[in-house]
């Protein structure tokens, strides 16, 4: 029996399963307590129970396997991992672990891990010899992540504009600069769907910090990947804990030579949360930002890199501007030069209801020649020369009009050549 499978079952099915096992009064219990009772009953019959989760090591040396379903929030169905197991397999916070578990004994509150079967979807022996993330060699992104799906849909137009304006590679550190109501969430959804469709080999994680609950639900339903969220009604310490767990998990997967992509909405809200949580240093910057507050969000954003030894970590984050808050301006200015891809959205274009509201002339990727073929790069530069004299609204309308006549960007360039 698998603990994760039980968590994914609806309560009605769990109650039916429990009643078959001879358990009573389940209808009045919470879901976690029902699972608890079923597993205890199952263990009495001497059968094996399996569980998995992402390890969080606490200050006392022991750890717990947290569940992604509850956005890594501590819960009664977390699995205890002893310090001896952590030392034996050289485990660190963020490791994804699956193995055999046992129910709590008398006086215990949590399930405990008996045997480790896999670490980061790999054999436990392989986990000991991996190179730490900090010791890996960072390089410029040189392997392209294509966004275009080629199905001619209106959603694909966004992906195609993105491919032309600022190509994304594995290991990119991208910043989407967005004023309010410019369509940043929809843009992120489009990017997530394109990645899931074109690059199923990549591990996709969407991290929503300080977002509205209905947007979280929408994202979970639309995106084929892990959606981790901390909504605006949660405390700042919770935002920080969720972000730390996600970045640690991503780093551990990169150590195993996996390509990981994190879409973060938004880095401004994350920096605000760190500003609330960090102990006061006494030095305060403009807008009420503590001098030490931006170190940790910069470490989060700076983790994005293409790795020479294999694997990559791509982070595409949104930064809020024109919100009327001085703090948001300061945070944006601090992050402005750190990315190697920038995609500014325009409020003017969005107000005219032209989407995607991308400011084509100001967007771009550093070292884009490493991501595109020389022939394609030449065509992209010619397109920029044509669009440059136009205003931002005219440029976007012109581009969308021409793109909608064709299914793919290659066809679009051929059409451009003929005309």
Curated annotation (Swiss-Prot):
> SUPFAM superfamilies of this UniProt entry?
Nucleic acid-binding proteins, P-loop containing nucleoside triphosphate hydrolases, Rho N-terminal domain-like
Q: What stretch or stretches form a coiled coil here? A: none
Q: Which GO terms describe its molecular function?
A: ATP binding; ATP hydrolysis activity; ATP-dependent activity, acting on RNA; helicase activity; RNA binding
Keyword Transcription regulation on entry = yes
Q: What is its EC number?
A: 3.6.4.-
| One cellular component (GO) term of this entry | cytosol
Enumerate the residues binding ATP: 169-174, 181-186, 212
GO biological process entries: DNA-templated transcription termination
Q: Which family does it belong to?
A: Belongs to the Rho family.
Q: What does this protein do?
A: Facilitates transcription termination by a mechanism that involves Rho binding to the nascent RNA, activation of Rho's RNA-dependent ATPase activity, and release of the mRNA from the DNA template.
Q: What is this protein called?
A: Transcription termination factor Rho
